[in-house]
Amino acid sequence: MKLQFLGTGSGMPSKQRNVSGLALDLSNVTWLIDCGEGTQHQMLYTKIKPRKVTAVWVTHLHGDHVFGLPGFLSTRSALDGTAPLTVYGPKGLKKWLEATLRVTGSHLGYELTVTEYSDGDTFIQDDHLVTVRKLEHRFPSFGFRIDGPEKPGMLRVDLVRELGVPSGPIYRTIKESDRFEFEGKWYDSKEYVTEPIPGKIVAILGDTIPCENARKLADGADLLVHEATFMEAEQALARKYGHSTTREATALANACAVGKLIVTHISARYVGREEEFVQEVVSDFPSSLVATDFLEYTVGD
């Protein structure tokens, strides 16, 4: 899984950061996590192809997370996108999106499905398991835990050779079948293949203050994407507006033993104070990045 941040600011666009938008590359398809105003314009500076986007996951319905969605859906159609697309989001998304497309006379040349989720829902999309949890914000906001598919184990070539099996197509048969035959005898393939390799886990949180569901989503994740709208000195402001601070994000990363933390949704008040902001994050959780627009990160790097 590879992520590219299309917008890392909060509230409104700035010269330094666009509003929320994140692309998740799953090798042969792409997902968007939120689609704030200008997201499709940001995509012009990347290699992301709208027609390859198969799903959009909306964390909540604040404008800085959804105002770019109708435009993106229309542009995808104009660029000859014909494959079906599913938009997942909280209650109210379907009504708003259908009204916007209807009132603007927007016609989509592909099948659009809008699925409204609730706390605890799970979905299988493009062979990935997505778990949805409700967070704590001034407005209904959610986060996602994305479990990638496990990969087959490695062939134990040493054991296979002990049987006298020559290299060739039978090696693939052993890996992909429950049993295999060699010289008139049948063998259980699992005895000659290592355990399956677990898929990568990515947790992506919408706007939130610290809460138990955030912990459930992040627990043991290879990557946690967490908002950090404010630095710790503005903790009172963070609580007033339903957001998290840098140290609240790092505290969760530490508590959940995540592999990597990337903080995003950064307030424009910190323009010119970027080094100070970064230091506050990495001093508490060294395996951290502060997202900037167009940052790319491959899970496992």
Curated annotation (Swiss-Prot):
Zn(2+) 2 binds at residues 64-65, 207, 265. It catalyses: Endonucleolytic cleavage of RNA, removing extra 3' nucleotides from tRNA precursor, generating 3' termini of tRNAs. A 3'-hydroxy group is left at the tRNA terminus and a 5'-phosphoryl group is left at the trailer molecule. The active site is at 64 (proton acceptor). Binds 2 Zn(2+) ions. Its EC number is 3.1.26.11. GO terms for molecular function: 3'-tRNA processing endoribonuclease activity; zinc ion binding. Zn(2+) 1 binds at residues 60, 62, 137, 207. It is an enzyme of class 3 (hydrolase). InterPro entries: Metallo-B-lactamas, RibonucZ/Hydroxyglut_hydro, RNase_Z/BN. Its cofactor is Zn(2+). Keywords: Endonuclease, Hydrolase, Metal-binding, Nuclease, tRNA processing, Zinc. Zinc phosphodiesterase, which displays some tRNA 3'-processing endonuclease activity. Probably involved in tRNA maturation, by removing a 3'-trailer from precursor tRNA. PANTHER family: ZINC PHOSPHODIESTERASE ELAC PROTEIN 1. Homodimer. Belongs to the RNase Z family. This is Ribonuclease Z. It comes from Exiguobacterium sp. (strain ATCC BAA-1283 / AT1b).
